[in-house]
């Protein structure tokens, strides 16, 4: 089967949700995508995760994973559910200022498809 990842601006209006859902349904039904990798940096990532959570009830064969850019600290553990996350091997040695870029490179290498939200 195939994998998909997401990249987009931090700010994302709720009006994007129906189109995102439509695109994801097409990827699942027409292109056999069953694995999704999501970041956690902004509204687009949160929206993608939310839509995937809904779609997993309709399409139980799909899975989604939040890909962490850094290991969680004590404060993160108090507010974040890490049950659906992974931390790619090798990122622990990456300087913090490069962590998101390296995580994104890892996600891109895993993906057959990329869904984006860009406003420029």
Which residues make up each language-model segment?
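Acidic/glycine-enriched connector segments
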Residues: 1-120
